[in-house]
């Protein structure tokens, strides 16, 4: 399968740089997987598309202000993007500098350059850094870090992004990108869903910067997926099994919830799904047989990205590319701060041949 098969033309003007004034005020493009039928609407239409007893699975990760600016003590500006917090004082990070720091190098970080860190070791593309500070990593980042807006949002981060680029139910700090499908849910909508009898469960997947990395191979099967930490606790497993037993749908909110649930399914030695705690490199592309997820709430993704491949595996390649073509024609807003889709799984998708 060629990566180029997942390309589409996207006018720059359709990339959303700011969210809608009201979280649930975005548009919703619904795609019926089995038939390919498209329906245009608004996000709150989701209330009518879900039935009592359906299970919504959210990702409760919280985005950390993971971007730091500074310089090497020896001179030379640099930018640090924390990828993973290892403990109270150590992180793995991407470091952008004219010359990469060597082990033992001292970094001066923050707008006042008053945060000191030491480069301990290099692990492939990531640098292990130790903050030489009494405060823990999260306290330091909250004090001097910048929100790591995606590269396609071409503006500096603003104070408002600390909450806007965050789901209202976020609880577990550790992500460097938001699980953006969840940004559309506000407190009133969550309350209405509960009143309607929609069940809810929460997984954790700390989204890494790798989610924005382009696929650098020509053939999909050659791509090596980045690693992210995920947790699917026993209560989520129980909720999924109970939902299936009552004949209702498991609805994943976002591709990170999909990847968490399907990782837990792959880990199950007996039965449909088992608790999962650890790193996942699951790469879902056409031909994949979904085990758990019946429907999906997701935003519009980048051309040739692993996420549009995941959606194509779920809805079918032709259905997905047609939906994206229609979304562009109807001027939907794309990417993290953009509009949403609601997709039901196409059971014939794994057998479909990918051909533009």
Curated annotation (Swiss-Prot):
One GO-annotated biological process of the protein: tRNA wobble guanine modification
Catalytic reaction(s) noted: 7-aminomethyl-7-carbaguanosine(34) in tRNA + S-adenosyl-L-methionine = epoxyqueuosine(34) in tRNA + adenine + L-methionine + 2 H(+)
Pfam families, per the entry: Queuosine_synth
Alphabetical UniProt keywords: Cytoplasm, Queuosine biosynthesis, S-adenosyl-L-methionine, Transferase
Major localization listed first in the record, in broad terms: cytoplasm
EC number(s) from the headed UniProt entry: 2.4.99.17
Cellular component annotations (GO), alphabetically ordered: cytoplasm
Cytoplasm keyword on record: yes
Pathway(s) per entry: tRNA modification; tRNA-queuosine biosynthesis
Protein localization: Cytoplasm
Molecular function via GO: S-adenosylmethionine:tRNA ribosyltransferase-isomerase activity
Domain of life: Bacteria
Enzyme class: transferase
NCBIfam families in UniProt: PRK00147.1 (NF001140), queA (TIGR00113)
Family: Belongs to the QueA family.
Described purpose of this protein according to its UniProt entry: Transfers and isomerizes the ribose moiety from AdoMet to the 7-aminomethyl group of 7-deazaguanine (preQ1-tRNA) to give epoxyqueuosine (oQ-tRNA).
Name of the molecule in the record: S-adenosylmethionine:tRNA ribosyltransferase-isomerase
Source organism of this protein record: Yersinia pseudotuberculosis serotype O:3 (strain YPIII)
Gene that produces this protein: queA
């Amino acid at each position: 399968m060629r990566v180029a098969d997942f390309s589409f033309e996207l006018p720059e003007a359709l990339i959303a740089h700011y969210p809608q004034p009201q979280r649930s005020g975005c548009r919703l493009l619904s795609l019926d997987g089995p038939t390919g039928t498209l329906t245009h609407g608004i996000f709150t239409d989701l209330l009518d598309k879900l039935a009592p007893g359906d299970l919504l699975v959210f990702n409760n990760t919280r985005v950390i202000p993971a971007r730091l600016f500074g310089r090497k003590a020896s001179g030379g500006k640099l930018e640090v993007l924390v990828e993973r917090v290892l403990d109270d004082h150590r992180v793995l990070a991407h470091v952008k500098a004219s010359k990469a720091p060597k082990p033992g190098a001292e970094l001066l970080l923050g707008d006042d350059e008053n945060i000191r860190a030491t480069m301990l070791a290099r692990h492939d593309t990531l640098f292990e850094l130790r903050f030489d500070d009494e405060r823990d990593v999260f306290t330091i980042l909250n004090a001097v870090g910048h929100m790591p807006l995606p590269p396609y949002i071409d503006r500096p981060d603003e104070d408002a992004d600390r909450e806007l680029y965050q789901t209202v139910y976020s609880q577990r700090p550790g992500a460097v990108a938001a699980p953006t499908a969840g940004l559309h849910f506000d407190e009133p909508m969550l309350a209405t869903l509960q009143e309607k009898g929609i069940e809810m469960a929460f997984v954790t997947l700390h989204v890494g910067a790798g989610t924005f990395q382009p696929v650098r191979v020509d053939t999909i099967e050659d791509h090596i997926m980045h690693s992210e930490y995920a947790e699917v606790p026993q209560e989520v497993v129980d909720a999924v099994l109970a939902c299936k037993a009552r004949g209702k749908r498991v609805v994943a909110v976002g591709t990170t919830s999909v990847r968490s649930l399907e990782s837990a399914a792959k880990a199950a030695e007996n039965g449909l799904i088992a608790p999962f705690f650890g790193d996942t490199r699951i790469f879902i592309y056409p031909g994949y047989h979904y085990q758990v997820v019946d429907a999906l709430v997701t935003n519009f993704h980048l051309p040739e990205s692993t996420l549009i491949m995941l959606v194509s595996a779920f809805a079918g390649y032709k259905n997905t590319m047609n939906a994206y073509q229609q979304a562009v024609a109807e001027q939907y807003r794309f990417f993290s701060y953009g509009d949403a889709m609601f997709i039901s799984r196409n059971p014939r998708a794994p057998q479909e041949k990918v051909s533009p």
